[in-house]
Design a protein with these regions (language model features):
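Acidic, surface-exposed loops and disordered segments
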Residues: 1-175
Length: 175
């Protein structure tokens, strides 16, 4: 292993060690647009099963919406108060081989030919139906997408830590 790889390994471990779940934010500290976009890009570039990226990122800026969220955010009130950016990382529902989303990702994002898209669709459907039984319930399918979404969220949080920015994953929403 070269000296540069050792340094990189050491730096990465320091970032992971520094990252923690921040429970209270300083309202006077604002994340720059450049840093925020780097955090979002880390999420966007995250790996996912079949490259489908079954997630959506929503920046919540609307104070009225934040107030509405507080009503359902069990245990997250301090995090919602004071954070300079609130990003909702949502899992997409209904991502199947037959979905418009699957086709759009294949054609428009991945530039896959019709012939190859058909092959991928058949393979993906077999994966979901036979190997992982994801098509037996909406819940199973959503749980699969949620697991993919966590990959993006963790990469975003690690990028934030690398930039010296605190973050916290919040799951406790009642609605």
């Amino acid at each position: 292993m070269t000296k540069n790889k050792e340094l990189t390994k050491k730096e990465m471990l320091e970032i992971f060690n520094r990252r923690y779940a921040c429970k209270k934010y300083d309202k006077t500290k604002v994340v720059s647009d450049e840093d925020f976009m780097a955090i979002i890009e880390a999420g966007r570039l995250s790996p996912s099963s079949f490259g489908l990226e079954p997630w959506k990122f929503i920046l919540v800026k609307n104070e009225e919406m934040l107030n509405d969220m507080r009503e359902f955010a069990w245990g997250a009130i301090n995090s919602l108060n004071g954070a300079s950016h609130i990003v909702m990382v949502l899992a997409r529902k209904g991502v199947t081989g037959d979905s418009d989303y699957f086709e759009r990702i294949g054609k428009e994002i991945k530039n896959i030919s019709e012939e190859n898209l058909k092959i991928r669709k058949e393979f993906f459907t077999k994966f979901q139906k036979e190997h992982f039984k994801l098509l037996e319930s909406e819940r199973a399918l959503f749980d699969w997408a949620s697991k993919q979404t966590y990959i993006a969220m963790v990469n975003m949080m690690n990028m934030a830590a690398a930039l010296g920015i605190d973050s916290c994953a919040i799951e406790g929403f009642n609605k």
